[in-house]
């Protein structure tokens, strides 16, 4: 293969959209619940997930956060915030080095229906590549790169540094996956594109070396 196996672990930026709790008025006549009201999570669900976020992001205690998420899963197995809880669980598991369990969480989620889906697809692709699931990894990287296929070469210098990093990781990851699947021409094309768009990027030296070896 053109590209040697290597694994990257770049934790996702996960920001669950926790809805605020609705207020009430004693004098207001009762009205039938709106569709939004019916879909809003109950206060206990909201509070429990907020506790998990605080433990994970503020207290930097992933084990305690996992305990809150375990409680959430038992009490609200089909809760309105279950996808956000799954992403938080994956983040906590990555922080304690349990990559396989984190990947299992990501495998269960419909990433395309969640905010910040590009980051999550790239992360899952990297984790899948890390355990040799090359074809599935390729599919994840393809989702991200197809979404930016119409952009010009200036994509290598976007104002959003995180978007810059995601696209570079997706290109490198797809080159790796294509190489492992026997598509050396596709891998070379991705390495060339990686150098063209990100000439001073984190993978540029290795991409240049590999292209030089396979001329």
Segments from the language model and where they lie:
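TPR/TPR-like (Sel1-like) alpha-helical repeat modules
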Residues: 145-146, 184-202, 212
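Low-complexity, Pro/Ser/Thr
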Residues: 1-86, 91, 95-98, 108-111, ...
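Short, low-complexity, Pro/Ser/Thr/Gly-rich segments in the mature regions of secreted, periplasmic
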Residues: 206-214
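Alpha-solenoid repeat scaffolds
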Residues: 79, 113-116, 151, 164, ...
């Amino acid at each position: 293969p053109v590209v040697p196996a290597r694994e990257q672990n770049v934790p996702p930026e996960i920001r669950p959209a926790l809805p605020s709790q609705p207020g009430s008025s004693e004098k207001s006549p009762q009205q039938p619940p709106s569709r939004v009201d019916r879909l809003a999570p109950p206060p206990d669900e909201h509070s429990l997930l907020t506790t998990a976020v605080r433990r994970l992001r503020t207290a930097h205690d992933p084990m305690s956060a996992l305990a809150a998420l375990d409680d959430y899963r038992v009490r609200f197995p089909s809760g309105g915030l279950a996808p956000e809880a799954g992403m938080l669980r994956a983040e906590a598991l990555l922080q304690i080095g349990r990559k396989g369990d984190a990947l299992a969480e990501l495998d269960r989620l419909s990433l395309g229906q969640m905010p910040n889906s590009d980051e999550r697809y790239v992360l899952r692709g990297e984790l899948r590549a890390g355990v040799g699931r090359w074809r599935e990894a390729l599919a994840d990287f393809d989702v991200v790169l197809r979404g930016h296929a119409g952009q010009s070469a200036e994509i290598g210098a976007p104002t959003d540094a995180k978007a810059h990093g995601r696209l570079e990781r997706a290109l490198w990851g797809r080159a790796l996956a294509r190489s492992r699947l026997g598509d050396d021409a596709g891998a070379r094309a991705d390495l060339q594109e990686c150098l063209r768009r990100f000439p001073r990027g984190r993978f540029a030296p290795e991409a240049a070396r590999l292209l030089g070896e396979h001329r």
